[in-house]
Amino acid sequence: MMLHAQHMPGQPGAPSLVFLHGFSGDCREWQPVGEQFHGCSRLYIDLPGHGGSTAIPVGGFADVIRLLRATLISYNILKFWLVGYSLGGRVAMMAACQGIPGLCGLVVEGGHPGLQNEQARAERRLSDGRWAERFRREPLTEVFHDWYQQPVFASLTAQQRQTLTALRSQNNGETLAAMLEATSLAAQPDLREALNALAFPFYYLCGERDSKFRALAQEVAATCHVIRNAGHNAHRENPAGVVDSLAQILRL
């Protein structure tokens, strides 16, 4: 089994870029940024429970990474950079720390490296469980209205919240809930030590108004790019700034 994806071929010898979206996004999320790198091969993946991969079930991170590997092989992508946002960034970090073959570099935007104690994990497990139950039972417009009131999204304007709520409400609540539980931050190990031992380039992007993830970026051995005029979802709020950072990272 493989994940649904959209593949755009590039020029021979150019880097291959593999993009992983955040929770409730899909393969279109990164395209305004990725399509500025038309010389590179670009693979935009739908994570399980999302987009064209809605019907693909997973029990945890191991399943997601197994599916990611199978998808890369199916497209004959043997050497690549992983670029992931939030949930996609956590999947990318997990894949990197587990030694996914062919990975040349890692770019994470607003991805959490992991909770550091059992109390924090227990609290997160309860929180994600409550959200999952709401995604299963309530109209998605109501759930996402509340979802985007969380502190991490404080920099969004009312119009941005309204737009995102309408967009994300097109998802399947049952499969979102299953993916939220399977890849909960509570189920993710603390990756700091493993990330600090990576043998390939590791870059971290965060919006200048995203104080939580700017602080987390200092806890990993990554080169940090702060994206101006942006909060947690920097590639949506300032795509040109993220394009500039990626161009510097990839030396394009």
From Swiss-Prot:
NCBIfam families: menH_SHCHC (TIGR03695), PRK11126.1 (NF008340). Belongs to the AB hydrolase superfamily. MenH family. Keywords: Lyase, Menaquinone biosynthesis. One of its GO terms (biological process) is menaquinone biosynthetic process. This is 2-succinyl-6-hydroxy-2,4-cyclohexadiene-1-carboxylate synthase. Monomer. Pathway: Quinol/quinone metabolism; 1,4-dihydroxy-2-naphthoate biosynthesis; 1,4-dihydroxy-2-naphthoate from chorismate: step 3/7; Quinol/quinone metabolism; menaquinone biosynthesis. The lineage of its organism: Bacteria, Pseudomonadati, Pseudomonadota, Gammaproteobacteria, Enterobacterales.
